[in-house]
Swiss-Prot record:
One of its GO terms (biological process) is mRNA processing. This is Maturase K. Belongs to the intron maturase 2 family. MatK subfamily. It comes from Galanthus nivalis. One of its GO terms (molecular function) is RNA binding.
């Protein structure tokens, strides 16, 4: 344990001191705007409160000006004791949102500077940082077919917010920062309920404080993986062959290869929605996305059990809470399917007989080949559609009443876009039949929504306008695939359903996929 403590303290030698006077400068709004204000900061809140995204810049300036006046800040703090700062009025709620976002932006500055300096130091070209989310699957196809065991890991979640504050306290010596952070967390007394639930394995961030909670959660996950790197270094005398980080930003993925371990703090940047991290050596491979990770090895079950033991004990020692050993499941790859990144993945074993002729003797050799297979988890997708009110839990399509007040073209466009995005993301599935069931649900849900709007039945509505109206909006993805794979090839979209396609433009996971 002393060795671990020294390992951690060595990396934390560069603790951060934040310049809080920046928070109270009148023109900090310009910095906030350059940091991606038009991207994701106020995307949800602007919809909730009816503000136009174009006016966010003026709102930030107005708020910072009010913060600059200490009376307004004192009023907000005092008023929060009565209204819980969650906002019984739209104004208080929106002001608290703005303060939280500005606070998060300031906190991100030191870590973004470290990332930029590292890229310049290593002279990493920008075009090398672009990488699709689908690029992880060829890596799994290439590596997992040679391995024996896989551990499905759910990153344990902290049971108390003070644990998160203590984690940050190890890195940050700025007392005002910690006090302000505690203030935000205590005011959101029910933050645990919307940050994570017992039934989900990933953190579900609050729409109101998404940026702030992403920052805190990324810090926490970094600490979990920091222990993992320490254990890995202690258990092997060989250096890692290669390792890297996939950082999903607002608009693209960045891949940083040959990243020094002490530089992995860059994953704590708040505007990274989700983070991949993996390393590979001849015998072990690790991949994580959000709060779910897989650890695959060519070793024995005993070796994987030792890894599980180390994980549980180090997490309990470091985070001071029960880390729930059942969150690490060890299974043999040959007879196990695991859900990862919206796909149900497994290792298929195919047997083929080869006749070998040697002089006058002939014999048959049975050859076993392993293949990494990915399919669409139809039941989980139907569950996601059910939560989004497109169908019942059994998959029966229903109307979407909340969209009934939109124009016909907007309704068709929304349903068509969801369907095309799902087809696009699950193009790597070896079995496409499940996708056509999802398409049927969305098409009929669209028809029911239009019929509800026009106060008619689905049959009457389709008879009047024709079923081709819906077909036009749901076939774009299939037309693209037809252009990519001409009829002269063996690929047919409605034929074998076995071809897998990994696209290089998948920059984020679909929300419906993420729910499942």
């Amino acid at each position: 344990m002393e060795e671990l403590q020294g390992y951690l303290e060595k990396d934390r030698s560069r603790q951060q001191h934040f310049l809080y006077p920046l928070l109270f400068q009148e023109y900090i709004y310009a910095l906030a705007h350059d940091y991606g204000l038009n991207g994701s900061i106020f995307y949800e809140s602007a919809e909730v409160f009816g503000y136009d995204n174009k006016s966010s810049l003026a709102l930030v300036k107005r708020l910072i000006t009010r913060i600059y006046q200490q009376k307004s800040l004192i009023y907000l703090v005092n008023n929060s004791k009565q209204n819980r700062f969650v906002g019984h009025t739209h104004n208080n709620f929106f002001y608290s949102q703005m303060i939280s976002e500005s606070f998060s932006i300031i906190v991100e500055i030191p870590f973004s500077l470290r990332l930029v300096s590292y890229l310049k130091e290593k002279e990493i070209p920008k075009y090398h940082n672009l990488r699709s989310i689908h690029s992880i699957f060829p890596f799994l196809e290439d590596k997992l077919s040679h391995l024996n065991y896989v551990s499905a890991i759910l990153i344990p979640h902290p049971i108390h917010m003070e644990i998160l504050v203590q984690i940050l306290q190890c890195w940050i010596q700025d007392v005002p920062f910690l006090h302000l952070l505690r203030f935000f967390l205590h005011e959101y007394h029910n933050w645990n309920s919307f940050l994570i639930t017992q039934k989900k394995s990933i953190f579900v961030f609050s729409k109101e404080k998404k940026r702030l909670f992403r920052f805190i959660y990324n810090f926490y996950v970094f600490e979990c993986e920091f222990l993992f790197v320490f254990i890995r270094n202690q258990s092997s005398y060989l250096r890692l062959t290669s390792f890297g980080t996939f950082l999903e930003r607002t608009h693209f993925y960045g891949k940083i290869e040959h990243l020094q371990i002490e530089k992995l703090i860059v994953i704590c940047r708040n505007d990274f929605h989700r983070t991949f991290w993996f390393f590979k050596d001849p015998f072990m491979h690790y991949v994580r996305y959000q709060g779910k990770a897989i650890l695959a090895s060519k070793g024995t079950h005993l070796l994987m059990t030792k890894w599980k033991y180390h994980f549980v004990n180090f997490w309990q020692y470091y985070f001071n809470f029960w880390s729930q050993p059942y969150r690490i499941q060890i299974n043999q790859l040959s007879n196990y399917s695991f859900y990862f990144l919206g796909y149900l993945s497994s290792l298929l074993i195919n047997s083929s007989a080869v006749r070998n002729q040697m002089l006058e003797n002939s014999f048959i050799i049975d050859t076993l080949t392993k293949k990494f297979d990915t399919i669409v988890p139809v039941i989980l997708l139907i569950g996601s559609l059910s939560k989004a009110k497109f169908c019942t839990i059994s998959g029966h399509p229903i109307s979407k009443p909340i969209w009934a007040n939109l124009s016909d073209s907007d309704i068709l466009d929304r349903f068509g876009r969801i369907c095309r995005n799902l087809f696009h993301y699950h193009s790597g599935s070896s079995k496409k039949q499940g996708l056509y069931r999802i398409k049927y649900i969305l098409r009929l849900s669209c028809a029911r929504t239009l019929a509800r709007k026009h106060k008619s039945t689905v049959r009457t509505f389709l008879r009047r306008l024709g079923s081709g109206l819906l077909e036009e909006f749901f076939t774009e993805e299939e037309e693209v695939l037809s252009l990519m794979f001409p009829k002269t090839t063996s690929y047919t979209l409605h034929g074998s359903h076995r071809e897998r396609i990994w696209f290089l433009d998948i920059i984020r996971i679909n929300d419906l996929v993420n729910r499942s």
